[in-house]
């Protein structure tokens, strides 16, 4: 994603235009030029914060987290995105020329082509497996013993990559610092302190 930058409102760098490319597994690519208006910048910030603070853009290691939590987080992203679209209305989804994209176009397509298929397939399958758990079996151990867990983890990772690419575009449009891949410097201990 490259963009021409200008100083925007509130002292941040806001792009006049960026190139966007999102690879949607099993569907293809959504790409184009985004020339955001102020409402799109504000909506981009809101959705960026949502994505940056959810497990949906953080890699889910093989022995980390619960699949149910990951699906629930993605479900919440769905609702929040719809809420943002309603709040900003048509201003974030204007008609544009072929080859151009808008906040609305990107958001709705990521929901419908990436998140929705994952949730509609895996939510009922995981629920059916969860109800088989005996009371004496730990929910974490039960979920990790599911033979389809690696397959679901792989699909969650595919969606995560789409959401990460979307978050990067939102970050540029909002004109803010990267809140997802922040490098934290190593902490040094002072002599004599624990």
What name fits each language-model region?
Residues 79-86, 90, 116-127, 131, ...:
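Charged/polar positions within long, soluble alpha-helices
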């Amino acid at each position: 994603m490259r963009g021409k930058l200008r100083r925007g409102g509130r002292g941040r760098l806001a792009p006049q235009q960026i190139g966007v490319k999102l690879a949607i597994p099993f569907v293809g690519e959504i790409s184009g030029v985004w020339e955001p208006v102020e409402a799109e910048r504000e909506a981009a910030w809101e959705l960026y914060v949502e994505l940056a603070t959810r497990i949906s853009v953080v890699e889910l290691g093989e022995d980390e987290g619960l699949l149910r939590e990951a699906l629930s987080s993605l479900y919440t992203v769905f609702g929040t995105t719809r809420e943002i679209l309603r709040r900003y209305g048509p201003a974030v989804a204007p008609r544009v020329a072929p080859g151009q994209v808008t906040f609305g176009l990107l958001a709705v397509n990521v929901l419908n082509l990436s998140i929705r298929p994952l949730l509609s397939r895996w939510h009922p399958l995981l629920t059916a497996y969860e109800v088989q758990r005996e009371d004496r079996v730990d929910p974490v151990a039960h979920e990790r013993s599911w033979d389809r867990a690696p397959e679901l983890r792989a699909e969650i990772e595919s969606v995560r990559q789409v959401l990460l690419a979307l978050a990067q575009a939102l970050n540029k449009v909002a004109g803010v610092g990267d809140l997802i891949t922040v490098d934290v410097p190593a902490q040094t201990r002072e002599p004599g302190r624990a």
